[in-house]
Amino acid sequence: MELRHLRYFVAVVEEQSFTKAADKLCIAQPPLSRQIQNLEEELGIQLLERGSRPVKTTPEGHFFYQYAIKLLSNVDQMVSMTKRIASVEKTIRIGFVGSLLFGLLPRIIHLYRQAHPNLRIELYEMGTKAQTEALKEGRIDAGFGRLKISDPAIKRTLLRNERLMVAVHASHPLNQMKDKGVHLNDLIDEKILLYPSSPKPNFSTHVMNIFSDHGLEPTKINEVREVQLALGLVAAGEGISLVPASTQSIQLFNLSYVPLLDPDAITPIYIAVRNMEESTYIYSLYETIRQIYAYEGFTEPPNW
């Protein structure tokens, strides 16, 4: 059995047609049919239902297909990573969600640059979902995000959980609780500004899920493009917003931050890399994160 047999079989299953699969693979249909027959004979198992239109897998064929696509994906990743390692220019590409710039990420990147003065570091702002695809396609090497998106090709590690705060106008009644804090059910009747508006899932999805977990359903929800816009509107008296605690570094006239007391009112911070990633630069990035976290006094630094 060779990799081409797996690629031929996967193409037939996905196209549900020998003719379309042959066109996709740029080979004639008769040789393709013979290769599939040879594969079945080698396995001693019928993988495709005979005479079905469109082409369908047998139960055994479906099982074989699931593992074939995983194996081919790993092979493609191996080839991509090998070519990247062989590249003359050493570059690491890092994706991040914008709100992390108000926390520890700038310090992590700065210390990492100091540790690797000859390494080219490229930064790309993108959502967690986009980071997942960019990692799989080799467009970035690491991603910092706030959502846990499961993907067998990606290793995602929780760095820490960050508390959520309520951003309010200084004249808002909730600001009277600035020293004590408020709960989610205190916000249910407020006009809430969430961000970003797209693509989903995103931070606004996470916030709405927290409300839902408490059996709460805010009805006055406005979604805006980014955190800076949300906070600017809050400062203008247009509503309130739920933001990570690190966002308090954004200070605007008449903008105030009130603690949110619910234990699960948190937003996680993850780092994501490819599952087979073994670059020394990635391990060095881990070590840089450990140093910053230790300096900040986090009791349980990430353990890779």
Curated annotation (Swiss-Prot):
Binding-site residues, cis,cis-muconate: S99, T128, F203
Cited SUPFAM superfamilies: Periplasmic binding protein-like II, Winged helix' DNA-binding domain
Binding site for benzoate 1: S99
Residue ranges of DNA binding: 18-37
Coiled coil: none
GO biological process entries: catabolic process
Molecular function GO labels: DNA binding; DNA-binding transcription factor activity
Presence of the UniProt keyword Transcription regulation in the record: yes
Family stated for the protein in its record: Belongs to the LysR transcriptional regulatory family.
Quaternary structure annotation from Swiss-Prot or TrEMBL: Homotetramer; dimer of dimers. The dimers can also associate to form linear, higher oligomers (in vitro).
PANTHER family associated with the record: LYSR FAMILY TRANSCRIPTIONAL REGULATOR, TRANSCRIPTIONAL DUAL REGULATOR HCAR-RELATED
Record function comment: Positive regulator of the ben and cat genes for benzoate degradation. BenM is necessary for ben gene expression but not for expression of the cat genes, which can be regulated by CatM. Binds to the inducers cis,cis-muconate and benzoate.
Protein name (record): HTH-type transcriptional regulator BenM
Record gene name: benM
